[in-house]
UniProtKB/Swiss-Prot annotation:
Coiled coil: none
Keyword hit for Zinc: yes
Family membership: Belongs to the peptidase M29 family.
Name of protein: Aminopeptidase T
Organism: Thermus aquaticus
């Protein structure tokens, strides 16, 4: 077995054993781009070797998506397969694990009318709501694992031939997910201990807010009442640990939906609905992004923020050190799974119930500051030029990050 095949097998094994922490006899519902079919077959093999009872996969095809967006009447863009997502949510509530294979061409829908892309995305977000709720409430174990899609590889390495670009991207994936180490499972156990130590410190401090300061950024993010920090291996509602993101470098919590003030500028591009949003900035008042703009992709961004009332509020704030393995590559990945783990970030939209004590829902969730929305979109605001302080209720400042690096 050559080194590449060995690492690919390690990644698939890691996704099942560490990412999902698969339970004996558990079903898996997987989603993936059609280009990842060979990798998905390997994942299915590892799943069955580790006790899965059924592996069901749903593929997405960007070429079909482009045809639809280009050809169907405008009114048809309001259609999305709600029946499919209701079925997925039902499977998760009944105990199936969720496995998402990420990795898409970030420019797959480039050149299409932004208003049509945005309209279809709104419909998709509405239909997807039951599935998103099941995921954010951690009703089951879930994970996201990357695949080196050729279109993604060309976006990251535009100057290389496609085959070489794909090889380079796989190398970056193996490094970021620690599968290039002799014992990836042990490496992840050690990594989780580091993340859990940060989580314990932040939860003990009970900060009232966080303050981000850097070029174009002066942002205060109030934290929800009874907020909890999470990071690394996370328990489901039933208490089973899983690692939701492979890779992950973040610790994150829930902002208070009404206590975000100031201005903030993105430090990395955002891949959104098959288009790139660059130079993103926002100004918040009373928790709402009252002004937003971007140098590129502004229309599709604003369409997303019009999805519902909660789309202009924050559902997540995450701290990520600027000297972690992903950031050290010096690459912009044009992929949220990677870029969010290279920089501190915030997210428009839905908050995670796991980030509030007792995992409340409904009115109690809202009363404590949890945000509700049909969308959840992370965007990166941290860098080596950004400092972060924790603010106690009495106004005391506690330095957390200086020049993007932990000081705790």
């Amino acid at each position: 077995m050559d080194a590449f095949t060995e690492n690919l097998n390690k990644l698939a094994e890691l996704a099942i054993r560490v990412g999902l922490n698969l339970e004996e006899g558990q079903e898996i519902v997987a989603t993936a781009p059609i280009e990842a079919v060979d990798f998905v077959r390997l994942l299915a093999e590892k799943a069955y070797e580790n006790g899965a009872s059924l592996f069901t996969v749903l593929y997405g095809d960007n070429l079909i998506a482009r045809k639809r967006l280009a050809l169907v009447p405008e009114a048809h863009l309001d259609r999305a397969p709600a029946w499919l997502y209701e079925g997925m949510a039902k499977a998760f509530h009944e105990g199936a694990a969720r496995l998402a294979v990420s990795g898409n061409d970030p420019k797959a829908l480039e050149g299409l009318p932004p208003e049509r892309v945005g309209r279809a995305q709104q419909a998709q977000s509405r239909a997807y709501r039951p599935t998103l709720s099941a995921i954010t409430e951690f009703v089951t174990n879930w994970t996201i694992v990357p695949f080196a899609h050729p279109g993604w590889a060309k976006a990251v390495f535009p100057g290389l031939p496609e085959e070489e670009a794909v090889q380079r991207l796989w190398q970056a994936i193996f490094q970021a997910t620690r599968v290039d180490q002799e014992d990836p499972v042990a490496a992840w156990e050690a990594h989780n201990r580091v993340l859990h130590a940060k989580v314990a410190f932040l939860n003990e401090k009970r900060f009232h807010a966080l303050h981000f300061q850097g070029p174009g950024t002066d942002l205060t993010v109030g934290l929800a009442e009874g907020h909890l920090w999470q990071g690394g291996a996370t328990p489901t509602k039933k208490g089973r640990l899983c690692n939701p993101n492979l890779p992950t470098e973040e610790v994150f919590t829930a902002p208070h939906r009404e206590r975000v003030e100031g201005v903030v500028r993105a430090s990395r591009p955002l891949a959104l609905s098959g288009q790139l949003v660059e130079g993103l900035w926002a100004r918040f008042e009373g928790g709402v992004a009252v002004e937003v703009g971007a140098e590129k992709g502004e229309e599709v961004l604003k369409k997303l923020l019009d999805t519902d009332e909660g789309a202009r509020r924050l559902g997540e704030v995450a701290l990520v050190p600027a000297d972690n393995p992903i950031a050290k590559t010096g690459l912009v990945f044009f992929d949220t799974l990677f870029d969010e783990n290279a920089a501190s970030h915030i997210a428009f939209g839905q908050a995670y119930a796991e980030n509030l004590e007792g995992r409340p829902s409904g009115e109690e969730f809202r009363r404590r500051g949890g945000n509700e929305s049909m969308v959840h979109v992370d965007w990166m605001i941290g860098s080596e030029e950004v400092d972060v302080d924790g603010l106690l209720e009495d106004g005391t400042r506690v330095p957390l990050m200086r020049r993007g690096r932990w000081v705790i």
